[in-house]
Amino acid sequence: DVCSSYLAGCEIKTQYCTAIPIGTALAQSFDTDFVQRCGDIVGEEMEHFGVHLWLAPALNIHRSIRCGRNFEYYSEDPLVSGKMAAAMTRGVQAHKGCGTTIKHYAANNKEYNRTRNNSMVSERAMREIYLKGFGICVREAQPKAVMTSYNLLNGTHTAESRGLVMDILRAEFGYQGIVMTDWVTPMTGDARSAHRDSQAQYVAAAGGDLFMPGNKGIMTTCCRASTAAQ
C-alpha cells in the first residue's frame, strides 16, 4: 500500500497511531461491536508497525476513585469489564501475529504503594468481583498473554501464586497463552515493605512463563534453584 511504499527502507522513529477512547469511555458505550472495531484498528496498526504484543487491555476494577489508572480500566462491574476486554481482544487478534495482554492479574486496584500493597480479599469477593472479568475474557477470547500484578494477594505475591496462575487461570478458566510478570516484578523490593521481595524462582514454580524485562540475574537465580531442587 501507499504507506508501506513510502516507508520502504526507512527506520521508523515515531509510531503515529489512531487515538481511540479511554477504557472507561469505551465501557460506557455498552457496545461490544464498537469495542471490537476499536481493537481491529489497533491490530491493523500493530501489523503495520511490526508490533506483536499489545500490553493492554487492563481490566482491573474501579474500586477507588483515587486510583490514578482508572481511566485505563473499564468499570466497577466485572461483567462489563470482561466483555469489553474480550471484544477488544477479538478485534486485535483477528490480525495474524497480533495479541493482547490482559492485566493486572489480580486485585491491583490502586497505584500508590502497589509494589508493597497486600490486597486482603475474601474468596467470595475474589470470585464475584476481582477474577470474574479475567475469566470472561479468557473463555471468550483467549488473549495471547496475561500479566500478573505487583501487589500481594492475601499475603502472596500474585506472580508467585500457583493457585492464581495454574489452578484458576489455566485449569479453571482454560487459559492457553503465556503468563508474564509486570515490569521488574522480581526486583521491586523496598526496605519499607513488611513483605519480602518477589523472587524469580517462586514465580517460575508458580507457572510464570516470562519475566519482563528480565536480566541475567533472574536467569541465574532460576538455574540455581532448579539445580538445588534436583
Model-derived features with residue positions:
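Glycoside hydrolase catalytic-domain context in secreted enzymes
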Residues: 1-230
